[in-house]
């Protein structure tokens, strides 16, 4: 493959893979259940998730946003959730999604409270260690989840409004200003919740090489005529802002658009 990056999804090293598909009944009592869905697919999937979860099943949600774990926990119980996030900068070309493996952070996971090196954390580390998956366990998983949430709100949404590539934040002071205002609102809410994202600044800033024309997931959804995850991004932030008495005018404007 002469491409500087490798394909993710239906194209990987120019090969097509067909994943093995199980029904929830067939997957019942699996040791590990990874939830990787678009936000609008989560609620319809909850009955299937519940059916697949057994007494000792660990559930990891790699979804965007900051509330998927809470939604899943209401269905299966808090004890099954191991908080996690995936950080990978990819862009679509033809039928494939491409990324740079050497700069991809991958999956980050951990317990919300001590012991942070729990038996299940060690088990996931051992499992992923036998694969090519990039991963890291952390004791600051809540901050990591919110750090990605911030990236999505600040980088995904403004470019989606105008239909511009990610280079718009570098080329336009106005786009950068919108991104900064969305960021300020999110950080104010995070601070009110006791979430200090500075704890993960040094470990979550590795960036994949993305061309200025790259269109992130929200804009890709609009391009394809799909429902976006704006409700998970700005919608959730607005709700949290109202609960905490923190104004979120830029997110309200973005949601309305």
Identify the function of each model-found stretch.
Residues 1-8, 12:
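Single conserved hydrophobic/aromatic residue that forms the stacking wall/gate
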Residues 13-98:
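Rossmann-like NAD(P)(H) cofactor-binding subdomain of soluble oxidoreductases
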Residues 28, 64-144, 148:
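Rossmann-fold dinucleotide-binding core
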Residues 53-56, 98-111, 162-169, 214-224:
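Helix-loop-beta segment of a Rossmann-like dinucleotide-binding subdomain
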Residues 129, 180-257:
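NAD(P)-dependent Rossmann-like dehydrogenase/reductase catalytic/cofactor-binding core
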Residues 134-138, 160-168, 196-198:
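Short, structured loop/turn "capping" segments at alpha-beta junctions
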Residues 142-170, 174-187, 213:
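Active-site-proximal catalytic alpha-helix in oxidoreductases
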